[in-house]
Amino acid sequence: MAETRTIARPYAEAVFKLAKNQNDLARWADTLQLAAAVAADENVRSLIGNPKISSRKLGELFLSVCGNRLNEEGRNFILLLAENGRLEILPEVNELYEQLKTRHEGVLDAKVISAFAMSDAQLKDLVTDLEAKFKRKIEAKVSVDADLIGGVIVEIGDEVLDASVRGKLEAMAVALKS
């Protein structure tokens, strides 16, 4: 995984630089998201790993799956990756590009783990509070973990805010053992 990310990083940075210069970050995000989804497909992955298929043919097959949803630059990028035998890194290129894009836009990614499904109003209130605390726009991805018993855990970068019942109980257990 680390090796794949190392290989994917220069591609993601090059696409990001191009997108930024063209003031077209959103279109490139869509292009990479589509290409990553195609590359992650089980059937496509089996083609990518097939040594009997030439890189040119593989690039053409990949583009045919994408259909007409890619512009000329997106198509050229796919063909470049195919020629270099790098189509399998598209999911990582997409992920790294998204990180560069959100950093450029001043957006922080927040991973919110809740004991129960959150309503839209609850999530909006939480995001508003987090934006006030961090003084940046927050993009939240929510998951549910019933083991928390109640409350939420918020992970932003290397900071963890644990407001869960499980976290409080664990802290009490540590305090009682001391």
Swiss-Prot record:
Q: Give the UniProt subcellular location, in the record's own words.
A: Cell inner membrane
- HAMAP family in UniProt: ATP_synth_delta_bact
List the source organism: Nitrosospira multiformis (strain ATCC 25196 / NCIMB 11849 / C 71)
**Pfam families in the record:** OSCP (PF00213)
- What cystine pairs are annotated? none
What the protein does?
F(1)F(0) ATP synthase produces ATP from ADP in the presence of a proton or sodium gradient. F-type ATPases consist of two structural domains, F(1) containing the extramembraneous catalytic core and F(0) containing the membrane proton channel, linked together by a central stalk and a peripheral stalk. During catalysis, ATP synthesis in the catalytic domain of F(1) is coupled via a rotary mechanism of the central stalk subunits to proton translocation. This protein is part of the stalk that links CF(0) to CF(1). It either transmits conformational changes from CF(0) to CF(1) or is implicated in proton conduction.
Q: Which NCBIfam families match?
A: ATP_synt_delta, PRK05758.2-2
User: Which keywords describe this protein according to UniProt?
Assistant: ATP synthesis, Cell inner membrane, Cell membrane, CF(1), Hydrogen ion transport, Ion transport, Membrane, Transport
State the protein's name. Answer: ATP synthase subunit delta
State how it assembles: F-type ATPases have 2 components, F(1) - the catalytic core - and F(0) - the membrane proton channel. F(1) has five subunits: alpha(3), beta(3), gamma(1), delta(1), epsilon(1). F(0) has three main subunits: a(1), b(2) and c(10-14). The alpha and beta chains form an alternating ring which encloses part of the gamma chain. F(1) is attached to F(0) by a central stalk formed by the gamma and epsilon chains, while a peripheral stalk is formed by the delta and b chains.
Q: Is Iron among the key words of this record?
A: no
GO molecular function terms listed in the Swiss-Prot or TrEMBL record: proton-transporting ATP synthase activity, rotational mechanism
Q: Carries keyword Membrane?
A: yes
Bilayer topology annotation: Peripheral membrane protein
- Source domain of life is Bacteria
PANTHER family xrefs: ATP SYNTHASE DELTA CHAIN
Family (UniProt): Belongs to the ATPase delta chain family.
Gene Ontology cellular-component terms for this entry are: plasma membrane; proton-transporting ATP synthase complex
